[in-house]
Amino acid sequence: MARQSAEPPTDDGQSAKEIVVITGGNTGIGFEVARQLLCNYGNRFYVIIGSRTLGKGHTAVAALKQQGYEAVQAVQLDVTKEASIAAAAKIIGEQFGRIDVLHVNAGVLLEPTDINAKPVPFSETIMETMRTNVAGAAATVEGFTPLLSIGSNPRVVFMTSTAASAQLMHQYSSMTTAPALSASKAAENIIMIYYYHKYPNWKVNACYPGYRDTAMMRRYNASSLSKAYRQPDPVEEGAYNAVRLSLLGKDGETGTFTEYKGVGEDGQRQYSALPW
C-alpha cells in the first residue's frame, strides 16, 4: 500500500490532523483501534500510542509503520502514575498544542495470584484492579483535560465491559468469575457518566469491545477464573465501535454505553445500547 505521510505540527504547535491519544495502545484492542484509524482515516487522524513501557510503544509504532502508516508515534504513559501522565501531556502539548480524542483504554484483569504470584486477599485484588481501571482512568482524563479543552470537539472513549452490568451479572452466574474486574468496570462507567455531565460540550461515551482474541483474554481463558464456553471473536471487530465513537461530530451521541452487534440486513454495521 502507499505510505502515508506524517504531518508535522504547524508553527504554533497545532496540527491540521485530529490528535488521538490511546492509553494502552501498544497491544490488544487499543492497538487495533490505532491501526483502523490509521488505515481508514489516516488523512484525518494522527495517533499517539500511550504505553506503560516506552519500548513496547516503539515496537507497536514500528509494526504500524511497517504496514505503511506514518502518522503515529509513542509516548511513555503509565495511568497509575500521575507524573507519567503529566509528562506525556507536556510532550504532546508542546508538539501539537491540543488533543481531540482520548481513548481511556489501558486496563488490567487480575487473578487472585497476579499481584504477588501467590494467593492474596480478594480485597487486595480489588484495590490493585481499581488502581488501574478506575483511578487510572480518572487520572488520565484529568491529566489531559487542558489539552482536550483546547479542541473544538473533544471526544473521550472509555473502554469498558458488560462485566460492569449489575443487571447481567445478577442474571448470569457465568459473569461472576472476575468480580474485581466487574466492580472496576462498573465504577469506570460511573466515572464516564461523571465526565459526561461535567463537560456537556464533549462527547463522552463508554464502549464494550466484546469478547475478543487479545492477549488479556487468552490469559483469562487459561486462568482459574475462566468459564469460557467458546473461543473469543476476532479482535478487528472489537475496535469498530471505538473507531465509530472517535468519528463523532459536534452533534454526536454522548453519555452512552454501546457495543458493535454485527452487520444488519442493509449491509451496515449495527450498534446497540447496553444495560448498566
Swiss-Prot record:
Single GO MF annotation: monooxygenase activity
Cited Pfam families: adh_short (PF00106)
Gene3D superfamilies assigned: NAD(P)-binding Rossmann-like Domain
Pathway recorded for this protein: Mycotoxin biosynthesis
Binding site for NADP(+): I29, S51, D78, N105, K185, T214
EC number: 1.-.-.-
InterPro entries named in the record: NAD(P)-bd_dom_sf, SDR_fam
Entry keyword Oxidoreductase: yes
Keyword RNA-binding attributed: no
Active site: S161 (proton donor), K185 (lowers pka of active site tyr)
Highest taxon, organism lineage: Eukaryota
This protein's UniProt keywords: Monooxygenase, NADP, Oxidoreductase
Family, similarity comment: Belongs to the short-chain dehydrogenases/reductases (SDR) family.
Reported function: Short-chain dehydrogenase/reductase; part of the core atranone cluster (CAC) which products are predicted to catalyze most or all steps of mycotoxin atranone synthesis, starting from geranylgeranyl pyrophosphate (GGPP). The initial cyclization of GGPP to dolabellane is probably performed by the terpene cyclase ATR13. The Baeyer-Villiger oxidation near the end of the atranone synthesis, which converts atranones D and E to atranones F and G is predicted to be catalyzed by the monooxygenase ATR8.
Protein name, UniProt field: Short-chain dehydrogenase/reductase ATR10
Gene: ATR10
